[in-house]
């Protein structure tokens, strides 16, 4: 994305608000497909899920009141979609972009844990088990203040796909 991840847009921008609404819709649509077991998603579902994740990233990059966490989370969602589709190279590309957004904006806590989780899953998909395990350990080691957020991260760290690691 060419949008500076450090930029936050003000409220009251009608076009930005429309992008925000579309970002939410596309994000939620992506999760509807991600929530289905692999055996229940068709090839058409996978394609729609992927397009929805890219649409979410596009709209979040232009949304009113966006912050760097929106960039990181959009990249995380793309990394997860590509991991679920078993394309480790694209998953790692987006996981690295997620991590870069976190580092550039000094995001920590929940977002940093998920950047490590995305890298771990992508590396596992690529068969790079040692690196994947190190990243999964890093994800589990990130301090997360909110107990509910911590529980969500911990749950995702044990949820498949982990590609045999």
Where would I find each of the regions flagged by the language model?
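Helix-turn-helix repeat elements of alpha-solenoid scaffolds
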Residues: 3-7, 43-55, 88-96
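TPR repeat positional signature
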Residues: 19, 26-33, 52-53, 75, ...
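Residue register of alpha-helical TPR repeats
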Residues: 24, 71-73, 114, 121, ...
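Residue signature of alpha-solenoid helical repeat architecture, marking inter-repeat boundaries
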Residues: 17-24, 47, 67-69, 110
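Short coil/turn linkers that connect adjacent helices within long alpha-helical scaffolds
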Residues: 16, 62-66, 103-108, 141-148
């Amino acid at each position: 994305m060419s949008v500076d991840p450090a930029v936050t847009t003000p409220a009251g921008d009608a076009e930005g608000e429309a992008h925000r609404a579309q970002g939410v819709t596309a994000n939620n649509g992506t999760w509807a497909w991600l929530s289905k077991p692999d055996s229940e998603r068709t090839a058409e579902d996978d394609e729609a899920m992927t397009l929805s994740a890219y649409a979410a990233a596009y709209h979040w990059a232009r949304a009113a009141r966006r912050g760097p966490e929106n960039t990181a989370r959009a990249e995380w969602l793309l990394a997860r979609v590509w991991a679920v589709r078993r394309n480790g190279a694209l998953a790692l590309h987006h996981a690295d972009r997620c991590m870069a957004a976190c580092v550039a904006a000094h995001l920590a806590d929940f977002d940093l844990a998920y950047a490590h989780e995305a890298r771990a899953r992508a590396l596992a998909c690529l068969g790079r088990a040692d690196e994947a395990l190190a990243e999964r350990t890093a994800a589990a080691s990130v301090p997360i203040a909110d107990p509910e957020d911590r529980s969500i991260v911990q749950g995702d760290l044990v949820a498949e796909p982990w590609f045999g690691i």
